[in-house]
Amino acid sequence: MPFFIILTARWRFGDYLLFIMETRTYDELKETPETKKNNARAALSEFAYLGGYKPWNFRKEALEYLAIKKALSEKWSFDGEAEDSYSILDNYLRYTFFRLFEENKIEYTKDGKWACFNTGLVNQTYVPIYALFQKNRNTGKQPWYFCAFIADGEKWGKFPDRCSVADFPRRPRRAQYLDNPSDLLYLVSEEKNELSLNFDHIFDRAERLPIDLLNELSGKQIPIKKQRGDFSNQIDYETYLSNYNDELQNVINEGNTRRRLQERFKTAVDMTRDRIVWNYKTAIPMYYPSTGKISLLLPLNLVKEDKVDLALVVSKGDGGYLAETIYPLNWAYRCARLICRPDSDWLTPSTITNDSEDEEDND
C-alpha cells in the first residue's frame, strides 16, 4: 500500500527545530479534514508522481507542451515572470484536479491500470484535453504517475500498454462550479442587493493593503513587507508575518487612520458599482478551493483612480452582497481562472505581478 510521510507538528527550541512525522496511506490521507482545508494544492502531487525534478512538480516539458502545442493559446504567466514558468497553468491543473476529486470525476479503466481526468482545456479545434496517468509500479510512492496530456482520439504508450480516452468506461467530465447562472452576475439595480463591507475582517488582512495607501492615510513611513526568500526557514518567516501584521494593525487603529481607510474603501466601491453598471463583466466569478464557495471579484482603486490595487471578494446572501476580504490580484486571477478564462479589462496576467506568495487557503 503506498504511503506518505506527513509533517504533523513542529516546535522550535532555541536554534533547533523539532519535527513530528507520521506515515499515512493515500486512502487515509484523502479522508483527513486537513487534506481539504490545507492541502487542496497538494492533492495532485499526493495522487501521482508528476515527473519533475522535484517529485511534486510537473516536468517543465509537459507544461510547455500543453501550453504551446496542445491547448488553445493563452497567457500562463504573470508580468515579470519568465514566459516558461507556467505558474498559472500549474496552479490551474492542481486545483482543477482537487475539484474533480471532490466530485468523484477521476476516471479509471476497468483493469485498474490507468486513470484520467478532464483538464477543462481544449485544443485549437475545441476538442477536450485530458491528463493521463498509469499505475505506479514503484511501491511506497504515489499510487499513480503522470504520462501525458491527450485529446480525444489520441493514444499514449507502446503496445501493448497503450491507452486512450475511449478505453475508460465513462468519458472524463469537466469540473462543475456553478449551479445557478445568476452567480456569475453582480446585480446593482435592486435595493436588496446593497453591498455591506465587513471592515473588521478586511482589515485583519492588513498586510494585503497597499503600503502607499497606509502611508498616505496615516502619515507614517511603513517598511515594505519582506518575502519568504529573505528568511532561512518558514517558522522565522511566519513569525515575521505575524509581527508585521500586528504593526500594521496598530497603524490602522491609531488616530483617524481607520476612519479614513473606511472612507477610501467606500469611495472605491462606489466607483466599482458605477463601473459594473457600465460593463457587467467588471464583476468576475471565482472559485475558492478550500471552501468550495463561489464568490465575485470586484476591482478596488484605492491609491490612484486609474490603477486597480486589489480585488474585493464578494459573496451573495439573501439580504444582499457581503464583502469579507481582499485578494492580491495574482491570487484573484488564479481563483477566477478555475471557472473560465476571465474576459476582463482589469484582471489580466499581463498587467499583474506575481509578488504575493501562495496563501490562498487563508481567506
Where do the model's predicted regions map?
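Intrinsic-disorder-associated, low-complexity terminal segments enriched in Asp/Asn/His/Tyr and depleted
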Residues: 15-16
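An acidic, glycine-rich, mixed-charge low-complexity segment common to nucleic-acid enzymes
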Residues: 19-291
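Short acidic DE-rich linear segments
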Residues: 361-363
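Compact beta-sheet-dominated globular domain cores
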Residues: 293-359
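Ser/Thr/Pro/Gly-rich low-complexity, intrinsically disordered segments
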Residues: 5-8
